[in-house]
Amino acid sequence: MRVGVTLACTECKRRNYTTTKNKKNDPNRIEMKKYCRFCQTHTLHKETR
């Protein structure tokens, strides 16, 4: 079952990306390095509720 999730920048706390994840394969929160246009650099983005 795929569900939509939002990724937030850990530096500025802005929610920049939306994506989907498979809850069966990834039961924990997702963490990805993505580009933040507000920080203007690649930062760690974490899944928000």
Curated annotation (Swiss-Prot):
Family: Belongs to the bacterial ribosomal protein bL33 family.
Keyword terms, alphabetized: Ribonucleoprotein, Ribosomal protein
The protein's name: Large ribosomal subunit protein bL33
Signal peptide limits: none
Keyword Transmembrane helix (UniProt): no
UniProt-listed Pfam families: Ribosomal_L33 (PF00471)
Name of the coding gene: rpmG
HAMAP family, A to Z: Ribosomal_bL33
GO cellular component terms listed in the entry, alphabetical order: cytoplasm; ribonucleoprotein complex; ribosome
SUPFAM superfamilies reported for this sequence: Zn-binding ribosomal proteins
Molecular function in Gene Ontology: structural constituent of ribosome
Lineage: Bacteria, Bacillati, Bacillota, Clostridia, Eubacteriales
Any one GO BP annotation for this protein: translation
Highest rank taxon of the organism: Bacteria
